[in-house]
């Protein structure tokens, strides 16, 4: 490949299996996962990827048991309040959360909104998808395309992903 992909999707997967196989708690597994996501984001930024979308929590995942959700939320809040601010320059990086904020804990949403307000740089964009549903995105893109009188492919908020890392 002569150039880096413009947009990379990250799907953290296997953290529950890793916890079981290694005798670790879910909380520890999800925290390690958030640290690994941060490492990958930094590598993508160094390699001149323009946008990275982290598929954090689908709407379907919200049906998981409370102990699993609490571990995901805690690691996500750590990612938002500690890892992202410590590793990414707000003057060069931007952040945006996509999904149904009404379905997420207030602390999670507040942490994401704080990053959205402060991280507005032009060089590297981080999208976080939480309480996200692809069908909702399709419906929203369809409505935007009709309102803006444009092709539906130009109306997606996330944009086309060139490569997925799972």
Question: What do the PLM-derived regions correspond to, one by one?
Answer:
Residues 1-166:
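Flexible, compositionally biased loop and terminal segments
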């Amino acid at each position: 490949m002569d150039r880096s992909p413009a947009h990379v999707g990250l799907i953290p997967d296997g953290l529950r299996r890793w916890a079981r196989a290694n005798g670790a708690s879910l909380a520890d597994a999800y925290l390690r996962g958030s640290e690994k996501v941060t490492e990958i984001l930094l590598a993508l930024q160094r390699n001149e990827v323009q946008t990275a979308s982290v598929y954090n929590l689908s709407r379907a995942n919200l049906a998981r048991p409370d102990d699993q959700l609490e571990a995901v939320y805690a690691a996500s809040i750590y990612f938002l309040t500690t890892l992202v601010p410590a590793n990414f320059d707000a003057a060069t990086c931007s952040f945006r959360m996509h999904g149904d904020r009404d379905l997420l804990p207030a602390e999670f949403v507040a942490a994401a909104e704080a990053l959205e307000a402060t991280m507005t740089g032009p060089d590297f964009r981080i999208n976080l998808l939480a309480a996200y549903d692809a069908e909702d995105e399709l419906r929203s893109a369809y409505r935007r395309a009709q309102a803006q009188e444009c092709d539906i492919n130009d109306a997606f908020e996330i944009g086309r992903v060139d490569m997925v890392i799972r």
